[in-house]
Structures are given as structure tokens and as C-alpha cells.
Curated annotation (Swiss-Prot):
Sequence intervals crossing the membrane: none
Encoding gene, per UniProt annotation: yacP
CDD domains registered for this protein in UniProt: PIN_YacP-like
Coiled coil (residue ranges): none
Protein name: Uncharacterized protein YacP
Domain of life the protein comes from: Bacteria
Pfam families: NYN_YacP
Organism: Bacillus subtilis (strain 168)
InterPro entries named among the record's database cross-references: YacP-like (IPR010298)
């Protein structure tokens, strides 16, 4: 099984759409990222865990599941990088391949040492955009292949039905 660990605020700061949303609302940017990760998870079958720094919030770590994506807000004084390193170490085994999405160069080297593979923010964005295009194409194809609203009938059958409609039952 593949597991993707995502440095949430790193993606928000690197993806143009999310960066624009962040200017108005961090919460909206987080929600859109989680939604995109849910689509990614659904399409790839990979488990996805998005980690956000507690970001000036005091207290304990908070975990939640949103659209079947695991979301972790780190505890006070713990960075997303630190939490991702711990998760990568804890989840890594012979049956699991860990991927870490971050553009933080130091974090990339740290996770390499634990056997995890890295994806930059740009690589993950491209992958997500490719998946979105594939989903759109598939939806268009399925929609266009819907059966026609009418059943093709021969001219003779149409004439018979028209007679019946007019009450001529002979």
C-alpha cells in the first residue's frame, strides 16, 4: 500500500490557486487542498494524510477525517515537518511505500533517510491536475454514451403507432 504524507501549508504556499485563496481565508485554502487530496486518494487508492502546523494555536494535536482524508494539526511547538518525519518512520514497513509531498529541501533529505520517496509541491500539483483532467474526460465520455432519449423505430412501426394514437385500431 502507498501512503502520501502531505505538508499542508507547504502545498498552500506553492499552489497558485491555494495561494490566492489563502490571501482571503486560510480555512478555505485548507478545505480546497483537502478536497483535492480526497479526489487524489479516491482515484489512486493511496492513503492520504495531510499535516498542518498548529499555526499559532496552543494545545494538543488534533486529528480528524475529512472526505476520508486523514488531517492532522500538530500539537503546540511541533512543526508539520517533525510530525511527518515521525509518521514516515512509524508507517514505513515492507508492505508500505511512503511518499512525502513537500518542497522543503531539508525535509526532503530527512525523509530520504527513512526510505520514503518525495514529491515536490509542483510534482503533486501536476499529478492532481492530470487526475482532474482524466476524471473530466471520463465523465464527458460516460455522459456522451448515455442512451438516446428515443428508441429508433422503423417507418412502418411509427405509422402503426400513429394510427393507434389517433384511435384507428385496425
Amino acid at each position: 500500500m502507498d501512503i502520501l504524507l502531505v505538508d499542508g501549508y507547504n502545498m498552500i504556499g506553492a499552489w497558485p490557486q491555494l495561494k490566492d485563496l489563502k490571501a482571503n481565508s486560510f480555512e478555505e485554502a485548507r478545505d480546497v487542498l483537502i478536497q483535492k487530496m480526497a479526489e487524489y486518494q479516491s482515484y489512486t487508492g493511496n492513503r492520504v494524510i495531510v499535516v498542518f502546523d498548529a499555526h499559532l494555536v496552543k494545545g494538543l494535536e488534533k486529528k480528524q477525517t475529512n472526505h476520508r482524508v486523514e488531517v492532522i494539526f500538530t500539537k503546540e511547538n511541533e512543526t508539520a515537518d517533525e510530525r511527518i518525519e515521525k509518521l514516515a518512520q512509524a508507517l514505513n514497513n515492507i508492505a508500505t511505500q511512503i511518499h512525502v509531498a513537500t518542497s522543503d529541501y531539508t525535509e526532503q533529505w530527512a525523509i530520504f533517510g527513512q526510505g520514503a520517496l518525495r514529491k515536490s509541491a509542483r510534482e503533486l500539483l501536476r499529478e492532481v491536475e492530470t487526475i482532474e483532467r482524466r476524471i473530466e474526460r471520463r465523465v464527458r465520455k460516460i455522459t456522451s454514451e448515455k442512451p438516446a432519449g428515443k428508441i429508433a423505430l422503423s417507418e412502418e412501426v411509427l405509422k402503426t403507432f400513429e394510427k393507434w394514437r389517433r384511435g384507428d385500431l385496425d
